[in-house]
């Protein structure tokens, strides 16, 4: 938040860093949920039980549906119809990370996930992470034009924020989000599906203003990690 604000919130004069050993092993867990609410609540649930994934990502089901219409190499999404959560666990042994991942799977059963996959090999893990990294490009390929925003809100406010973001869509313009569940950073993408240029320019101004007001109302910031 402070780095992204580029000096508008505070000026850092001194930083003390503590180095930790590089993790030896990691285990990626990909979970599919039927509802956005349960997907976004999953991190709070596992955190309450002491699990601390090194990465926690979420992808809206609209993003996945769009990706499936394009010719992509990401075969893992073929049967995905819900919202995706990535949890990546790291540690000093394979047993350690596997134990964390299995405990996570057990905990989230109360939210009735549609599926949960342990992604074991480095090649499979890279395929899933490549899909996540390619999201912006995929959305740009799909839409006539695209505008991206980068808001951040408290993690507890993610469900209500994402609900409001989805409500910004119109018949000709789709608004969706994905991002970092672990810090509340949402990459909001406004997609021109079939609006003409003049309507698009007016709509993007209105939608952006509503989005920025939403971020502030949710105790967040207009800029997450990419600056102003």
Set out the residue ranges of the language-model regions.
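Noncatalytic alpha-helical scaffold of FAD-dependent oxidoreductases
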Residues: 1-228
């Amino acid at each position: 938040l402070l780095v992204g604000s580029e000096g508008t919130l505070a000026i850092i004069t001194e930083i003390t860093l503590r180095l930790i050993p590089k993790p030896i092993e990691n285990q990626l867990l990909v979970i599919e949920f039927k509802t956005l609410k349960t997907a976004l609540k999953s991190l709070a649930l596992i955190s309450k039980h002491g699990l601390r994934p090194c990465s926690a990502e979420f992808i809206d089901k609209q993003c996945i549906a769009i990706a499936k219409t394009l010719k992509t190499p990401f075969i893992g999404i073929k049967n995905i119809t819900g919202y995706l959560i990535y949890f990546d666990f790291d540690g000093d042994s394979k047993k350690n990370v596997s134990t964390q991942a299995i405990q996570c799977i057990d905990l989230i059963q109360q939210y009735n996930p549609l599926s949960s996959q342990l992604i074991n090999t480095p090649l499979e893990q890279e395929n899933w992470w490549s899909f996540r990294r390619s999201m912006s490009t995929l959305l740009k390929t799909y839409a006539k034009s695209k505008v991206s925003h980068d808001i951040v809100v408290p993690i507890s406010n993610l469900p209500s924020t994402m609900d409001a973001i989805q409500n910004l869509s119109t018949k000709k313009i789709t608004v969706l989000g994905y991002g970092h569940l672990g810090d509340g950073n949402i990459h909001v993408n406004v997609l021109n599906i079939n609006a003409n240029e003049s309507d698009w320019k007016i709509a993007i101004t209105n939608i952006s203003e509503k989005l920025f007001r939403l971020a502030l109302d949710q105790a967040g910031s207009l800029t997450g990690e990419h600056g102003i």
